[in-house]
Curated annotation (Swiss-Prot):
GO molecular function list: zinc ion binding
Zinc finger (TFIIB-type): 1-30
SUPFAM superfamilies xrefs: Zinc beta-ribbon
Domain of life: Archaea
Cofactor(s) listed in the protein's UniProt record: Zn(2+)
UniProt keyword list: Metal-binding, Zinc, Zinc-finger
Binding site for Zn(2+): C3, C6, C22, C25
Keyword Kinase among UniProt keywords: no
Protein source organism: Saccharolobus shibatae (strain ATCC 51178 / DSM 5389 / JCM 8931 / NBRC 15437 / B12) (Sulfolobus shibatae)
Family membership noted in the UniProt record: Belongs to the TFIIB family.
Matching Pfam families: Zn_Ribbon_TF
Name of the protein this chain belongs to: TFIIB-type zinc finger protein
Length: 170
């Protein structure tokens, strides 16, 4: 087949648009006509069971939903402890303790629950009233002990000395 206008043999069958086009001059030479019977209907259809893949997708979706639910609950608890922490910082003594701990760099990287536990510990550490306070806020003493161990004994004494200096100034 050749182009009637330019005589070129470079003809392109554009099945997407249903046209026969000359690649040299770009003229549409003819339209492509399809038969009434589709090729997909003439062949035997093969049915593949996708239940395995569907089950796997459902399992992944459920896993993601459960993770998001648990994550929301954790965020709500964290928000509660942040609210408690902010309300405690209204008190002048807690504010001073927080400032000293912040200046020492101890509060960086800790969650609000741990910060709250440290504030309670440094406020009531001398008379062991902090254990009762920790129970009220559902803070485990073991977690507080781990944080205090990470801080170290020398640093703890330094912090207590700074807190005593702050209280002597007033």
């Amino acid at each position: 087949m050749e182009c009637p206008v330019c005589g070129s043999n470079e003809i392109v069958w554009d099945n997407k648009n249903g046209e026969v086009v000359c690649s040299n001059c770009g003229i549409i030479i003819d339209n492509i006509y399809y038969s009434g019977q589709n090729e997909s209907e003439s062949t035997d259809t093969i049915i593949i069971s996708n239940t395995f893949y569907k089950d796997e997708i459902l399992i992944k979706e459920l896993r993601i939903k459960n993770f998001l639910k648990k994550n929301r609950i954790k965020n709500k608890k964290t928000d509660q402890y942040e609210i408690i922490l902010r309300s405690m910082l209204v008190d002048a003594q807690y504010k001073k303790i927080y400032k000293v701990l912040y200046d020492e760099g101890i509060l960086s990287g800790l969650k609000a629950k741990s910060k709250l536990g440290l504030l309670i510990y440094f406020r009531f550490a001398l008379n062991d009233r902090y254990l009762h306070q920790l129970k009220e806020f559902n803070i485990k003493n073991e977690n507080l002990r781990k944080i205090l161990k990470r801080i170290g004994r020398k640093r703890l004494t330094l912090i207590f000395d700074k807190l005593n200096e702050e209280s002597d100034r007033i």
